Amino acid sequence: MPTIQQLIRNSRQPAENRTKSPALRACPQRRGVCTRVYTTTPKKPNSALRKVARVRLTSGFEVTAYIPGIGHNLQEHSVILVRGGRVKDLPGVRYHIVRGTLDAVGVKDRRQGRSKYGVKRPK
């Protein structure tokens, strides 16, 4: 506990809140190029092959981003849009790829929650 005199000498500093997605540099999304597309396994107690991509962003960062939805067309050198948002059961994955923009096509045969997967309204 500081004395009154110590507080007069230098006041209390407010705690700075750190961003959860530093690679975006305070932008809503960033463009990037896939350097590697692969699958990885989640933490316990879950079991799956989650699709992820290593992405070099225009901000200079290289991050791991999750590819949402069933099936994708991404490969090395695909240009994609990355947004924030972590995947709870994949350690180190703090970004999502935006489907339906740039080289990432929307999810095929998607009927519900289409806006999250870049799918136009079916006729």
UniProtKB/Swiss-Prot annotation:
Cellular compartments annotated: Plastid, Chloroplast
MF terms in GO: rRNA binding; structural constituent of ribosome
Compositionally biased tracts (Polar residues): 1-16
GO cellular component entries: chloroplast; small ribosomal subunit
InterPro entries per record: NA-bd_OB-fold, Ribosomal_uS12, Ribosomal_uS12_bac
Coiled coil segments of this chain: none
Domain of life (superkingdom): Eukaryota
GO biological process: translation
Pfam families: Ribosom_S12_S23
Region (Disordered) location: 1-23
Keyword tags: Chloroplast, Plastid, Ribonucleoprotein, Ribosomal protein, RNA-binding, rRNA-binding
Primary localisation category: plastid
Keyword DNA damage in annotation: no
Protein family per UniProt: Belongs to the universal ribosomal protein uS12 family.
Function: With S4 and S5 plays an important role in translational accuracy. Located at the interface of the 30S and 50S subunits.
Subunit structure: Part of the 30S ribosomal subunit.
Name of the protein: Small ribosomal subunit protein uS12c
